[in-house]
């Protein structure tokens, strides 16, 4: 069913199916591709999808492209252009006007394209006025009504219909002539019937020959199939032999590479072992000792030089460890006793701690200033000493260097000594005894828990204290550090000055005491009698 604006979808599909069934419309107008589904309503030709893209680039002022399957909103003028045009009519018109190019820009901008576009538009307007909304139109009758004097494409294309008209007229003439004598001649009853005589389509006259379809497969020659003269067994045998040779070469190369790799690895291991032995391996001392003994036995004159230079380890310990021989336990032959180091008399260049007063100096003035006169008064038993003791005397203080030196000499920390008779303890017993201990002392290790009298007296002084250090226990920490310091000359000068002033004060006290004593002296024994 159709309307005034355009054909319906069903009518459009019917008309397109009928137009695509024509042989010229089965190929693309530009490239010749099969089954085109696009068209340009400006020229009324069918195109493929690739050529439709080219027409879109040309612009709608030259060509307007539409799809025959997807677009459904066609107008009657567009449908008339496809019905009156076609690929066959367009090809013939372009060839007649000398347009044989395949380039789209030149082809559709040429003079022939403009003339064909204008002519097709005029024919569409006339057919629309005559047929209106009729879907199927008679293009043959429409072509016959054209003036004969116009010799153009459409007149030439549809000129063959004149033969049909001539045949019809002659038939009609024959029918009229025979009607006078109805008893003779052929029957012409079909002329009076209302059924129209079918005529061939004018488009079929345009085609010279039907287009042949290309067939798949190879083209057969006149000779036909021939027998192959190739020995496939020989080819297969040569291929198998080639594979065996290749496999043998690969195996030989692999074996040679593995052998070379193993040799290189062994050489590297030997070099590494030699380097390690040169660096870290210890020589066997017993073997060297035997060699040296053999040399000494041959030449007795070498014994003195060997003992003097200590070569070969002769006379030394015969037990040693070796990397190759492993580690073994060595038993100690004897236990060495520790000797108390002798205290040097001179601690520094300034003072010597030796005498009972705590200091021995090379200068007589130092001995004079460092004497304590109050300590000697307790040893005197004469009356003169008792007399001097009755007076108050100021004690002379010792110099700080003398006191520090005397304290450092008299308060040395006792140390624990090993007895010569202590028996050595084996490693197994020590491991059993101290295996789980976190810390051990030398007394626990050597088994000497007894303390000497000096240590016991020092510990007695620190009883009752919560904490004490080595300085509190032995009393020599700060004094030893002070005595080891070198005194400054200014300090010595001050000390000498203080000592001189104290001596002068002492002499002044003694002289005043002696004067007082003489003034209070008792009368002589001769006067009493």
Swiss-Prot record:
Residues 291-301 have a biased composition (Basic and acidic residues). GO terms for cellular component: Golgi membrane. Residues 291-313, 335-357, 398-424, 468-493 are annotated as: Disordered. Residues 476-487 have a biased composition (Polar residues). It holds the Pfam family ArfGap. Residues 399-420 have a biased composition (Low complexity). CDD domains: ArfGap_ArfGap1_like. Residues 13-129 form the Arf-GAP domain. It comes from the Eukaryota. GO terms for molecular function: GTPase activator activity; zinc ion binding. SUPFAM superfamilies: ArfGap/RecO-like zinc finger (SSF57863). GTPase-activating protein for the ADP ribosylation factor family. This is Uncharacterized protein F07F6.4.
